[in-house]
Amino acid sequence: MKRLKRHLQVVFLTVLVFLTTSIRAQEATPRQLQEMDSVEIGLLTCSPGKEIYSLYGHTAIRVHDAATGQDVAVNYGLFNYHTPHFIPRFVFGLCDYEMGIYPFELFMEEYTEEGRGVIEQRINLTRQEKLDIINALTFNARPKNKVYHYNFFYDNCSSRARDMIVDHIHGHVGYRVNASVTSSYRVMVHQWDEQHPWDCFGCDLLLGVNADRKTTLRQQQFLPDSLRASFATAKVFREHQPPVNLVDSTWTALEAQAPETDSSFFDVFTPRVAISILTLLVVLASVSEYHKKKIYWGIDLALLLVDGLAGLVLFLMIFSKHPTVSLNLQILLLNPLSLVGLYSVIKKSRRGQYSKWLTMFAVCILLFFIGNFLQDYASGMNILALCLLDRCIVNYVVRFKDNNVLTR
């Protein structure tokens, strides 16, 4: 969820120091275990940013040794936005992220510049658990281990940080679960992108049926703030010991700056507004066509072309590695078959005839409406469906009324 860091030389030196300390700690002695008393390990939760990849916040780990002065941030959200074909690779679930270790001071500098807040939860760990986490981070930081296959819902900066901490606790971590609170991936994402209507629209356009299924508490922890909230009330159950809070203390390392209140044109001109205006114009044109008994085939050409191209994108998403996008009922509306039937529709329209491709499109649109019971669609999609259904109906009515015949 973050850009590739600057100061690569500093990062490299920091990793060397961290690795040296950790390798020494692997040969654990009672004294070295005692040295862990000065080590604090915390979960860092960062507030959302302005860029699309930072809308949902960020999670990192802090390792601070008060005795040596070593203070580093462990970040599982490093990527290079300028990598060739980054956006397509991200969309199709082919993007690689990597883990990086660098001075906590640099970590805070970036968030200060971006006006984002940082909350640290210091984790209640034993000496051995601290040592195990440091050794695991050392192993993870090796060049052959630091790169991982990113998945927004299942394997991201939050899940990696959670697993690094929880998997090295010698006991069981119990979370407080509210059975009355259920949520889907789509609803949870909306909590963070609903103030950005076009980003929200694009996300909803790609998410399919599986994004509307109920999630478990563990699945909900893909969001940084959800993980923070889960940790805040979690208990650690160690053998022959009373349960203790997972989080020893919480403090705000950096206050978030108040967001800018100035709204842009696209905050008002939302996808729903844009689609509504388009639909109104199309309906007005259809009324004119009905009275003049003449089809403006250019409208159908433009709509089918755009519809088919958008449908082609949804078709390609079937092959995406993201598990929540492959089954998407919106493909019944944004239909790649529009490109296949485009020639027939326009050819027959120019001859004053009706193409039965339009009948097939109308059936798909009706199935799309039924799909509302199974999937939440992107904002304005049902209005767009009415717009396209209007084109199917007006073509049928005008051609049938004018020629009283249907032709293939």
List PLM regions with ranges.
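Extracellular structured ligand-interaction cores
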Residues: 58, 71, 120-122, 158, ...
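Second-shell loop/turn segments in exported
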Residues: 49-50, 116-124, 143-152
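Glycine-rich catalytic cores of cysteine/serine-nucleophile enzymes that process amide/ester linkages
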Residues: 37-115
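Activation targets extended, charge/polar-rich intrinsically disordered C-terminal tails
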Residues: 139-354, 361-408
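Residues embedded in well-ordered secondary-structure elements
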Residues: 14, 32, 49-52
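Short, charged, amphipathic alpha-helices and their helix-cap/turn boundaries
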Residues: 128-137
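Bacterial Sec-dependent N-terminal signal peptides
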Residues: 1-28, 404-408
